[in-house]
């Protein structure tokens, strides 16, 4: 799936000061990241604060992004959860005509075994009418999809086309790359180790910092894929401090502060998240201004 090689960005849901969805700001952000050179957009992922959105708000976010994108880039829709039957039902009833793939997170909170994870994604694969990208983020789900489970799924179901690997473990990523079928994508879900993963054979990234600074981060990814290592690492180290900063007080609080600094949206997040404090706000604002010089 060539469409998902490079930089995908996990779009935020911008809110007004009254916490309502800011559709105009969302359109500005879509145009900003497309102009910045990213390869695809991820809709209603973790960074979208999807857990705090009503169903009507989710539909509004989808419609707004589809309209703003206007067919320019492939769209990936986040559909996942810890109720397998509910996930399957949405996969069977959702209109996917504007989407190229689904991003589906490993079940959280229930802490399933590896066999439970396999059976969950077996049902997801059988229900989905479009390709599926698995999503492993044990820091949020409390269960790690081991390489053996991922590779078993990849070999058994051809519409499972890749994984967003966000365990933060480069050795685990390399085991996936080593054992994967030829066309299976191993996509970084951790901005800090994206470049090392690419150089180890990874396919790219689904990024948060790449949404805040799309021009610089997507260029780093392209240089890595082209094996222009020295040039890629110049950009990696240029951006490294900002990656730490945007996750310092929660995601997407950090990247929303960048958008506020850029004049694209408010920095409003919904509880239980809170906006970054004044110290971090000042540091992100300074970094953003220095990067644009």
UniProtKB/Swiss-Prot annotation:
GO BP annotations, alphabetical order: diaminopimelate biosynthetic process; lysine biosynthetic process via diaminopimelate
Assigned keywords, A-Z: Amino-acid biosynthesis, Cytoplasm, Diaminopimelate biosynthesis, Lyase, Lysine biosynthesis, Schiff base
Signal peptide residue numbers: none
EC main group: lyase
Binding site for pyruvate: 47, 206
Pathways per UniProt: Amino-acid biosynthesis; L-lysine biosynthesis via DAP pathway; (S)-tetrahydrodipicolinate from L-aspartate: step 3/4
Location in the cell: Cytoplasm
Name of protein: 4-hydroxy-tetrahydrodipicolinate synthase
Role played: Catalyzes the condensation of (S)-aspartate-beta-semialdehyde [(S)-ASA] and pyruvate to 4-hydroxy-tetrahydrodipicolinate (HTPA).
Gene Ontology CC annotations of this record: cytosol
Main location: cytoplasm
PANTHER family: 4-HYDROXY-2-OXOGLUTARATE ALDOLASE, MITOCHONDRIAL, DIHYDRODIPICOLINATE SYNTHASE
Family: Belongs to the DapA family.
Superkingdom, natural source: Bacteria
Entry annotated with the keyword Glycoprotein: no
Organism annotation: Flavobacterium psychrophilum (strain ATCC 49511 / DSM 21280 / CIP 103535 / JIP02/86)
GO molecular function, one term: 4-hydroxy-tetrahydrodipicolinate synthase activity
Quaternary structure and interacting proteins, as annotated: Homotetramer; dimer of dimers.
Disulfide bond residue pairs: none
Gene assigned in the entry: dapA
List of catalytic residues: 135 (proton donor/acceptor), 164 (schiff-base intermediate with substrate)
Entry EC number(s): 4.3.3.7
Sites marked Part of a proton relay during catalysis: 46, 109
Catalysed transformations (reactions): L-aspartate 4-semialdehyde + pyruvate = (2S,4S)-4-hydroxy-2,3,4,5-tetrahydrodipicolinate + H2O + H(+)
